[in-house]
């Protein structure tokens, strides 16, 4: 399994130690923002398509103001890195299979028309689906023993663009005819959601002998769950092309869900929720907005949940220094000099992020990502502490601090497992660092996707939960952006009473919760970046209570 110690698995910046690892990383919005985000790779080639060999060559035609922003990067990235630039993920070896139980043609679904109550005809479901197909394999539970419930796996195909997204569905252990459906997304960007399946909240985990171990607190105890490897070239997904921004990924997810619920209408009538962590703080506002934008849809979206997410960088990056310096509920990791240095760097960082927010331009957003990650995450990371859990050191740098990732990768690379799931690629990787880099260099990292949340709140509830021991997407920053968000319910939300979170019958609380209208924030005690891994029973408790509408607007 190819993993670089400096790269973030679940959603922190791969540029956190950019100064030390720049060459390795480089080689190895909507509306105005969407228009401005042209591929930065275009700027690193001349008119004939040949790569430039230095910053001077690439940026000689820029204005003085733009050059000044990029001078920050010039100090961090060696010229030699430009000689090996590659902007497309290398396609994995793969072979197409033909042993599928179902194949759903997007063109057929798009061609279905219905009449409304007034006799007017319209498409049964909206969206451009003609280029998509969904392939479905009924997984034999006895082959893998991950769970005994009904399971499906397969691929969403975008044949025109050679994109193939892998998914794995687990039916609810309880009452699948009535229980809700959840789509789970890990972050990265570029990390497999099968990480969430086996390391956090799925029906089983993998031990060091590659044995499957049952999880009594799986999120499919009372809900059916879809785990999706997205964007393409992540996990078991593959493509000859690439996706390098969140908005493009949203189109694929809408198509997947539409075709899946068309094939399985018994699940389409259930409540549907999107949940994820880390960079899913970017994904989920965009994916939810994409779904809600379609009036005629078969996706019964009822809420979204974001755990330890990166959603509003301008607000969240201010809270790295307090978390590292003893103000987040845990002892300080950094000394006074380093804390002062982070304080000194913050105004420049916020200025760069604000420029990104206002322009949406890749030329503003990339410098913001690199400078801020180096200044705000780099000092902490250089201590050797776990960026996902402030309570201890990074114990397995070859697996991004968690040996369990290695076990999962070894398990999923077994041919018997791949055959049982209908996998078409030759290998599984937990994270694709080309994707991580491409999102960074498309300016996606600092895009203000939190601005989509107020519109979402008009239609469905939103839960932001955060393990309070995480550094990389810490609870201080997540609480801060929820309180800073401009929406009609802001005043009431900020004034809402903070209540204890407790298991039924327990005396001691496991966290705090604040809710008003459709907005809820939770702090979960003694949990790092991956709350379901660190607090499995407690996370299942708040999930079930959320699905039952405990904190929804009445």
UniProtKB/Swiss-Prot annotation:
Gene3D superfamilies: 1.10.287.410, alpha/beta hydrolase (3.40.50.1820). Glycans are attached at residues 222, 518. Residues 1-17 form the signal peptide. The active site is at residues 278, 470, 529. It is found in: Vacuole. Pfam families: Carbpep_Y_N (PF05388), Peptidase_S10 (PF00450). GO terms for cellular component: fungal-type vacuole. Residues 18-137 form a propeptide. It catalyses: Release of a C-terminal amino acid with broad specificity. It is an enzyme of class 3 (hydrolase). GO terms for molecular function: serine-type carboxypeptidase activity. Its EC number is 3.4.16.5. Transmembrane segments: none annotated. The keyword Thylakoid does not apply. Keywords: Carboxypeptidase, Disulfide bond, Glycoprotein, Hydrolase, Protease, Signal, Vacuole, Zymogen. InterPro entries: AB_hydrolase_fold, Peptidase_S10, Propeptide_carboxypepY, Ser_caboxypep_ser_AS. Disulfide bonds join 191-431, 325-339, 349-372, 356-365, 394-401. One of its GO terms (biological process) is proteolysis. The keyword Glycoprotein applies. Belongs to the peptidase S10 family. PANTHER family: SERINE CARBOXYPEPTIDASE CTSA-4.1 (PTHR11802:SF113), SERINE PROTEASE FAMILY S10 SERINE CARBOXYPEPTIDASE (PTHR11802). Vacuolar carboxypeptidase involved in degradation of small peptides. Digests preferentially peptides containing an aliphatic or hydrophobic residue in P1' position, as well as methionine, leucine or phenylalanine in P1 position of ester substrate. This is Carboxypeptidase Y homolog A. It comes from Chaetomium globosum (strain ATCC 6205 / CBS 148.51 / DSM 1962 / NBRC 6347 / NRRL 1970).
């Amino acid at each position: 399994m190819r993993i670089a110690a400096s790269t973030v698995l679940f959603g922190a910046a791969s540029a956190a130690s950019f100064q030390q690892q720049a060459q390795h990383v480089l080689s190895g919005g909507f509306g105005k923002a969407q228009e401005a985000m042209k591929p930065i790779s275009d700027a690193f080639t001349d008119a004939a398509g040949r790569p430039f060999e230095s910053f001077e060559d690439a940026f000689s035609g820029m204005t003085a103001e733009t050059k000044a922003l990029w001078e920050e990067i010039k100090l961090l990235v060696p010229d030699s890195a430009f000689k090996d630039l590659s902007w497309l993920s290398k396609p994995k070896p793969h072979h197409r299979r033909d042993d599928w139980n179902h194949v759903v043609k997007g063109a057929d679904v798009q061609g279905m028309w219905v009449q409304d109550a007034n006799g007017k005809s319209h498409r049964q479901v909206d969206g451009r689906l003609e280029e998509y197909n969904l392939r479905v394999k009924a997984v034999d539970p006895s082959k893998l023993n991950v769970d005994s419930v009904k399971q499906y796996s397969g691929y969403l195909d975008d044949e025109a663009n050679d994109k193939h997204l892998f998914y794995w569905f687990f039916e609810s252990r309880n009452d699948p005819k009535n229980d809700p459906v959840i789509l789970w997304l890990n972050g990265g960007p570029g990390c497999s959601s099968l990480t969430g399946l086996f390391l956090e909240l799925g029906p089983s985990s993998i031990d060091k002998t590659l044995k499957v171990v049952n999880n009594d607190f799986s999120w499919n105890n009372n809900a059916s769950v879809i785990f999706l490897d997205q964007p393409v070239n992540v996990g078991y997904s593959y493509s000859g092309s690439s996706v390098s921004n969140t908005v493009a990924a949203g189109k694929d997810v809408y198509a997947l869900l539409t075709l899946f619920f068309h094939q399985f209408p018994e699940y389409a009538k259930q409540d549907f929720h999107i949940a994820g962590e880390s960079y899913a703080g970017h994904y989920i506002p965009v994916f939810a907005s994409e779904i809600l934008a379609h009036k005629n849809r078969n996706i019964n979206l009822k809420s979204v949940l974001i755990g330890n997410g990166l959603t509003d960088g301008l607000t969240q990056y201010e809270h790295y220094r307090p978390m590292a310096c003893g103000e987040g509920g845990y002892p300080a990791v950094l000394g006074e000099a380093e804390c002062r240095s982070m304080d000194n760097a913050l105004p420049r960082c916020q200025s760069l992020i604000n420029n990104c927010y206002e322009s949406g331009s890749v030329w503003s957003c990339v410098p913001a990502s690199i400078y801020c990650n180096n200044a705000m995450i780099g000092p902490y990371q250089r201590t050797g502490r776990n960026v996902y859990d402030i309570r201890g050191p990074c114990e397995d740098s070859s697996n991004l601090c968690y040996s369990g990732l290695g076990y999962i990768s070894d398990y999923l690379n077994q041919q018997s497992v791949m055959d049982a799931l209908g996998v078409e690629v030759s290998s599984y990787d937990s994270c694709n660092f080309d994707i991580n880099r491409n999102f960074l260099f498309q300016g996606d990292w600092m895009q203000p996707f939190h601005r989509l949340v107020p519109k979402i709140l008009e239609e469905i509830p939103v839960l932001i939960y955060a393990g309070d021991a995480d550094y990389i997407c810490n609870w201080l920053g997540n609480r801060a952006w929820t309180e800073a968000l401009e929406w009609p319910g802001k005043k009431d939300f900020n004034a809402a009473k903070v209540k204890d979170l407790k298991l039924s019958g327990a005396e001691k609380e496991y966290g705090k919760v604040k809710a008003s209208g459709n907005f809820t924030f939770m702090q979960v005690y003694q949990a790092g970046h991956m709350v379901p891994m660190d607090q499995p029973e407690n996370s299942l408790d708040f999930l079930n209570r959320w699905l039952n509408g405990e904190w929804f607007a009445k």
